[in-house]
């Protein structure tokens, strides 16, 4: 049944010749002691050779144990036999017809929202007609709405009134202004009732009234100007705007004036969106541009959130200059930027080009008229080259209430381009577009004045719906997008109507597309920006919008550029391209049917979604594996279907399985979102007892008479097919000798059906098909896949998963279509126990010199002495061989074709990820290749039939090996190059993007996009009263287990060996429940938030950042090397900085890692170094134990601050001991373990939700705190990033 992957080259180990070293004076040596030593050395080497030689046999022993676990404990063989016997229908997917159907479904969704927007627009326009005869001016102020009118609403995640709307007012509102809000109430309420996925609805009036429904009490801090928000601006002026802001900071500008100018520039930045292009210049004696991206010197950049953030940083850093202002130089540069941008892009006829000049208008005393004339000559000439299409807007900065008339006249002449007044002849007969001049002082409301700059631009009366890109819903969960339209009465603009739509609902058909394993789908907008792609996290779980990334970076394969051009230019079409296997994407490789070929075909079929700006595309990898769908099945008579909602069903035999509500009576079935026809509806609505009864009746119905409660067609057959495993699992629960080590057994199908035993209550958002155990099994079909260790969200501590695919038909020759994945969770310590029991060599010297380990095919350790060592090395997730065995890692990198270092681009956090892939086609074993590593011998071989390797290390003396790892985060130490044979921990580098074009730098353009990250898992909190009343399902009787072997690895038990100080050995070790001594330390804090122990913080961290104890000599050597490395680094860094004219916030940070703390930690351990040698490697290395934090806003900001062209020498630049200025919000269970508290500031927004998210530089991100525990655990260190202002 098992099939080996064929695509990897077979690796044969280097031949190792074992011979005794030539001994001095042998034979007949005059000095017997030396001869005797040599003999002993030979004998030791021979013994090691014999031990080493058995590694292949030992691997076979482990393989047979893995096969036994998969067959007997999990039931893989039985399940495969059952699936072989079932009847299937075959289906080949047709991209062209599929894309039409899917586009139609998405169009219908958008049409519902367009209908809502159009209905609201009609009501507003009709109300205005009524207003002319009977004024509508009644105001319901959001700031004074009584709390009694509102109640909490889960859809909005805040208190709202679903019957009335309320208003926010701008400072300039006339008391008789048109306000249709009260007329709108009934229509808006009806819309909300009849449309799932709808969020906030609003009307923004041109007179300054913002009406929002449902009503919500905002914390009001002064006036609210909605008309300078991007959604309003892009709806009333939908044409693209090319804007250059020039900021005068010459000698004549006072500090007060400069501050007004800087604030005004920030307002302009916050009013535009990614459809516009922007540049900010400062002018005094010379012109400066923002240096955070080299392209800003040459082109305008799309006003994405990233560009606006960089420009905002630049504006904030502007300082007064001592030199007089050269107005002409500033305008010359501004026109150059506009011209180069127009030349490099396809010119659109309706693009508005604007220069906004924030200046005091003062010219030099000596040559005032010449300065003015020179400035207007530049404007006249340069605008002539652009057919006089550029408008100039000037804002006069008043100096303490006084502004000279000459200065105002000059600024008016600039705005009106009065070159004739200065005797300058016109270059072209085309008329100029006259702008306007406005005066600004300290009392000016900048949002109402400068923020409304667009009113000077021509109103082309475009009455079309505008779709925003996704942004965070600051009041609720997830991402939203806005659909808006302008309202007119004749030619009079009344304002805009808008509706916020839940992105998860709009994209559900794309997110959960499951036609076949060989196909997937993506959605882009008409500019090529990606809204949804398989390598993006589900929108339901996103708290921040993905970076606006072009589809070309996700589909990074040769010839896709031509496909992209066709997708954007043709409303309907298809195209096939041939891709060499060595240029392929990882998610293509997993979908290939014939892995031996050098190339494969990819078929793209696309369709424009009618009435929107979005394009849907379906991708099929050819030749594809035909999809096999089960024919109608009947349920197994003996099996009882139990839905996982035990809390609703009132199960009499309920118990607690650690922290989960569970039952031992039968497995439970959970249907994840992908099982439903409308996944969003399932996720957003609470399940009721009645719904659960309907599901159960439908799924158990052999008569086929009960109506489908909204499930996909194939789900019932999958539920019935998986029910065959129930009897086997129940029998094993009674008979198996391993029950004390097994946490749970489960089986999942591609449509998201999960059957689990013991039957457990699961979180509604859980999707088994996106978990690592599932993805690993699918990537290794027919093999036993090992995943972990990871902290079990259900409360069982650290677990390791064995998973295996089940196929539609499986023969010795080939595995068919994957129809299910089975998995079983064991305790982490059980795996180490297996290693010790089955490989006596690991125990033969009490573990002093010989260490054994198991690692999976990415290099992460599944079993290793330090993972179970209570002294300073608590079990940790994501521990890599480079962390724990650097000497082995250094050596195996030199074996040809065995290990490959991979790069991929992660656009969710804008990083380049470096990882390892080990060749599972290894034949034989590997041993030391590099001469000179006499202190440490290792042997490594694959465990046949699995994705894992077993290794044995024999260390006879201290040796020094170095793998480059950051001490405090995941930053690579050298981001300039990656050598295949250089040892470094899995790490990440900033992804360098050219902000003006959205393209990556050339080197990174070749990297594939990373696959989707593992999603965080939450566990459903149960009623505390119920928790106290229920017994544990499994009682391990830890207190009755007297021997270490009887306690080690048993469910919920720990063998307590270390006292509560984290260092002292107990006089008498004993067995206790996990919460009493987690990790073997008495009183240690559990990583679970609700199991707080009594130990101080210094022990809880469990010395997570420590390396092994350093002896005096090795410590000295290490110190010297570190000093030398840092000295060279500092010297090169200094030289490098001088060679650059700009500084980046990252490259110029202080080198502020507190190495002293790390050294002190190491010294504390020195006392114990002898007694620790039994379990801990004496190899010296620097280890990073920071796991990747998938969506931390802090990490994103850290990387975003980079230039697209700057260098990075990569040593960490963060202070681990200081508090972050913007601590990331966090409800991780592990955070309790390292005592990093929650930082959810209670954010009650001053701005209504749908626009607040667009002011990202003003608001911290906030997500509500749910009583849930996340499962993707990350060690978090509070840090401060020392940024340096980007002076330009």
UniProtKB/Swiss-Prot annotation:
Family matches, as PROSITE patterns: VWFA (PS50234)
Residue stretches of biased makeup (Polar residues): 1210-1229
Topological domain spans for side Cytoplasmic: 1131-1288
Stretch list, region Disordered: 1157-1176, 1187-1237
Glycan-bearing residues: 159
Keyword annotations: Calcium, Calcium transport, Glycoprotein, Ion transport, Membrane, Repeat, Signal, Transmembrane, Transmembrane helix, Transport
Keyword Calcium in annotation: yes
Recorded superkingdom: Eukaryota
Signal peptide limits: 1-49
Cellular component, GO annotation: membrane
Biased composition range(s): Basic and acidic residues: 1159-1174
Bilayer topology: Single-pass type I membrane protein
Compartment(s): Membrane
Parts of the chain that traverse the membrane: 1110-1130
Residues covered by the Cache domain: 467-546, 786-867
InterPro entries associated with the record: Ca_channel_alpha-2/delta, Sensor-like_sf, VWF_A, vWFA_dom_sf
Main location: membrane
Residues annotated as domain VWFA: 242-457
Entry keyword Plastid: no
Function: May regulate voltage-dependent calcium channels.
Family recorded in the similarity comment: Belongs to the calcium channel subunit alpha-2/delta family.
Entry protein name: VWFA and cache domain-containing protein 1
Organism: Mus musculus (Mouse)
């Amino acid at each position: 049944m098992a099939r080996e992957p064929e695509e990897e080259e077979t690796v044969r180990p280097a031949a190792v010749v074992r011979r005794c070293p030539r001994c001095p004076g042998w034979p007949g040596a005059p000095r017997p002691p030396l001869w005797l030593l040599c003999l002993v050395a030979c004998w030791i080497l021979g013994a090691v050779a014999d031990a080493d030689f058995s590694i292949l046999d030992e691997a076979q022993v482990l393989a047979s144990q893995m096969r036994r676990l998969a067959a007997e404990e999990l039931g893989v063989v039985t399940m495969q036999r059952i699936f072989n016997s079932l009847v299937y229908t075959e289906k080949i997917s047709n991209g062209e017809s599929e894309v039409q159907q899917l586009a139609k479904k998405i169009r219908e969704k958008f049409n519902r929202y367009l209908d809502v927007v159009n209905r609201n627009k009609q009501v507003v326009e009709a109300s205005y007609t009524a207003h002319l005869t009977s004024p509508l001016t009644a105001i319901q102020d959001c700031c004074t709405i009584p709390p009694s009118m509102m109640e909490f609403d889960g859809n909005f995640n805040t208190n709202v009134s679903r019957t009335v709307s309320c208003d926010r007012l701008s400072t300039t509102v006339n008391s008789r202004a048109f306000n249709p809000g009260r007329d709108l109430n009934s229509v808006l309420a009806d819309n909300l009732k009849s449309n799932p996925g709808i969020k906030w609805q609003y009307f923004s009036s041109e007179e300054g009234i913002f009406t929002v429904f449902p009503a919500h009490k905002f914390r009001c801090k002064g006036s609210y100007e909605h008309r300078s928000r991007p959604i309003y601006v892009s709806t009333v002026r939908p044409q693209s705007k090319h804007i250059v802001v020039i900021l005068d900071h010459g000698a004549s500008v006072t500090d007060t004036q400069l501050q007004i100018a800087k604030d005004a520039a920030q307002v302009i930045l916050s009013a535009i969106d990614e459809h516009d292009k922007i540049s900010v210049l400062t002018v005094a004696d010379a012109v400066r541009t923002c240096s955070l991206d080299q392209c800003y010197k040459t082109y305008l950049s799309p006003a994405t959130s990233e560009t606006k953030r960089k420009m905002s940083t630049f504006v904030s850093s502007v300082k007064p200059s001592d030199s007089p202002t050269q107005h002409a130089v500033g305008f010359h540069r501004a026109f150059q930027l506009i011209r180069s941008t127009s030349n490099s892009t396809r010119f659109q006829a309706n693009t508005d080009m604007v220069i906004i000049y924030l200046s005091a208008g003062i010219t030099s005393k000596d040559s005032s008229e010449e300065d003015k004339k020179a400035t207007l000559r530049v404007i006249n000439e340069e605008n002539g080259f652009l057919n006089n299409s550029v408008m100039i807007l000037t804002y006069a900065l008043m100096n303490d209430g006084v502004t000279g008339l000459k200065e105002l006249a000059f600024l008016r002449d600039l705005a009106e381009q009065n070159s004739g007044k200065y005797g300058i002849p016109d270059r072209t007969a085309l008329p100029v577009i006259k702008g306007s001049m406005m005066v600004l002082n300290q009392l000016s409301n900048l949002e109402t004045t400068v923020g409304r700059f667009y009113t000077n631009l021509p109103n082309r009366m475009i009455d079309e719906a505008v779709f925003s890109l996704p942004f965070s819903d600051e009041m609720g969960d997830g991402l939203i997008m806005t659909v808006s339209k302008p309202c007119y009465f004749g030619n009079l603009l009344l304002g805009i109507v808008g509706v916020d739509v839940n992105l998860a609902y709009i994209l559900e058909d794309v997110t959960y597309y499951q036609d076949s394993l060989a196909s997937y789908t993506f959605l882009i907008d008409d500019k090529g920006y990606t809204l949804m792609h398989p390598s993006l996290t589900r929108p339901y779980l996103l708290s921040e919008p993905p970076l606006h990334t072009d589809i070309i970076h996700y589909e990074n394969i040769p010839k896709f550029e031509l496909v992209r051009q066709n997708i954007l230019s043709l409303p309907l079409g298809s195209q096939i391209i041939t891709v060499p296997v060595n240029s392929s994407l990882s998610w293509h490789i997993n979908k290939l049917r014939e892995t031996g070929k050098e190339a494969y075909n990819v078929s793209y079929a696309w369709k424009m979604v009618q009435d929107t700006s979005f394009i849907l595309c379906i991708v099929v990898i050819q030749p594809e594996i035909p999809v096999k769908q089960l024919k109608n099945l009947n349920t197994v008579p003996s099996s009882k279907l139990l839905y996982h909602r035990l809390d609703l069903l009132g199960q009499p035999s309920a118990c607690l399985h650690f922290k989960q509500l569970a039952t031992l009576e039968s497995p439970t079935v959970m249907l994840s979102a992908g099982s439903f026809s409308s996944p969003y509806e399932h996720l957003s609505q609470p399940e009721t007892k009645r719904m659960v009864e309907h599901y159960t009746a439908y799924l158990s119905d052999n008569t086929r008479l009960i109506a489908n409660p909204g499930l996909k067609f194939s789900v019932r057959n999958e539920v019935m097919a998986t029910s065959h495993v129930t009897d086997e699992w129940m029998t094993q629960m009674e008979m198996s000798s391993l029950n004390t080590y097994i946490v749970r057994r489960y089986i999942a199908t591609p449509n998201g059906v999960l059957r689990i035993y013991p039957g457990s209550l699961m979180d509604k958002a859980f999707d088994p098909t996106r978990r690592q155990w599932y993805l690993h099994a699918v990537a290794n079909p027919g093999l036993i896949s090992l995943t972990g260790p990871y902290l079990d969200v259900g409360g069982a501590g650290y677990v390791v998963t064995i998973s295996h695919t089940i196929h539609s038909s499986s023969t010795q020759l080939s595995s068919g279509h994957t129809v299910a994945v089975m998995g079983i969770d064991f305790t982490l310590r059980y795996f180490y126990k297996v290693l010790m029991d089955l490989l006596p060599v690991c125990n033969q010297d009490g573990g002093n010199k010989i260490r054994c380990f198991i690692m999976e095919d990415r290099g992460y350790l599944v079993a290793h002495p330090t993972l179970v060592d209570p002294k300073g090395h608590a079990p940790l997730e994501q521990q890599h061989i480079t962390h724990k065995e650097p000497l082995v890692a250094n050596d195996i990198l030199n074996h040809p074709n065995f290990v490959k270092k991979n790069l991929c681009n992660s656009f969710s956090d804008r990083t380049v990820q470096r990882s390892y892939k080990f060749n599972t086609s290894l034949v034989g074993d590997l041993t030391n290749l590099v001469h000179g590593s006499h202190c440490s011998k290792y042997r490594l071989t694959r465990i046949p039939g699995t994705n894992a390797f077993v290794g044995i290390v024999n260390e006879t003396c201290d040796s020094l090996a170095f793998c480059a790892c950051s001490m405090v985060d995941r930053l690579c130490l050298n981001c300039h190059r990656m050598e295949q044979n250089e040892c470094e921990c899995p790490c990440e580098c900033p992804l360098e993007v050219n902000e003006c074009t959205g393209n990556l730098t050339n080197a990174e353009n070749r990297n594939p996009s990373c696959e989707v990250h593992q999603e965080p898992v939450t566990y459903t909190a149960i009623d505390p009263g119920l928790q106290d009343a229920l017994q544990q399902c499994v009682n391990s009787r830890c207190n009755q287990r007297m021997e270490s072997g009887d306690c080690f690895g048993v469910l919920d038990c720990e063998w307590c060996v270390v006292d509560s100080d984290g260092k002292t050995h107990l006089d008498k070790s004993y067995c206790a429940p996990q919460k009493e001594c987690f990790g073997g330390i008495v009183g240690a804090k559990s990583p679970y938030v609700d199991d707080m122990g009594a130990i101080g913080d210094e022990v809880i961290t469990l010395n997570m950042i420590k390396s092994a104890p350093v002896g005096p000599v090795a410590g000295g050597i290490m110190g010297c090397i570190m000093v030398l490395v840092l000295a060279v680094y500092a010297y090169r860094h200094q030289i490098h900085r001088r060679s650059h004219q700009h500084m980046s916030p990252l490259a110029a940070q202080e080198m502020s890692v507190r190495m002293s703390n790390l050294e002190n930690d190491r010294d504390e351990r020195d006392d114990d170094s002898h007694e620790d040698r039994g379990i801990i490697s004496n190899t010296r290395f620097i280890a990073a134990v920071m796991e990747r934090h998938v969506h931390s806003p802090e990490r994103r900001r850290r990387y975003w601050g980079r230039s697209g062209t700057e260098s990075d020498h990569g040593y960490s630049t963060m202070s681990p001991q200081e508090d972050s200025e913007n601590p990331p919000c966090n409800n991780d269970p592990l955070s309790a373990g390292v005592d990093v508290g929650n930082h959810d500031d209670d954010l009650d927004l001053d701005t209504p939700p749908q626009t607040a998210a667009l002011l990202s530089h003003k608001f911290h991100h906030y997500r509500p705190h749910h009583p849930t525990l996340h499962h993707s655990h990350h060690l978090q260190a509070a840090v401060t990033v020392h940024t340096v202002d980007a002076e330009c």
